[in-house]
């Protein structure tokens, strides 16, 4: 009888913990370092890599020079010219292999790609404030940190409100 009870408990609790959302999953607005204007919207999403649940990030929208969303997953046009196979910018995975470090409350050991240059860097992601996320790309001790703004889906066009990331896995273009 006790084996049946334990089986029931583990059988019902395991799926809940297995599908618990990783921190920071959601939509973020990136800001151009030089012009301080909105550049893109990135969807951070979780995916399975073997037995590990990891974090990745995909560009889901781009802004024009006036700060208006000009491209989404429905209408990508601009290409990442310096990225292998010149993919569209919208739909491009720019973050992958990010592993959660519960002690440091950050994601690390992953990669981030600059879609303009095609260069890939080590990355760390953490949060100091609830309205933004720190995203750092680095080579050794040298790097740059950007603040990404938390976006509410309801403030965005319909196409960005209910993105289904369930079958997403990063496509890495080295």
What is each of the regions a protein language model found here?
Residues 2-7, 20-23, 27, 33-36, ...:
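Amphipathic/hydrophobic helical signal segments and adjacent flexible N-terminal regions
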Residues 30, 57-59, 108-110, 133-136, ...:
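Short hydrophobic/aromatic-rich beta-strand segments that constitute the beta-sheet cores
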Residues 105-139, 143-147:
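Surface-exposed interaction patches
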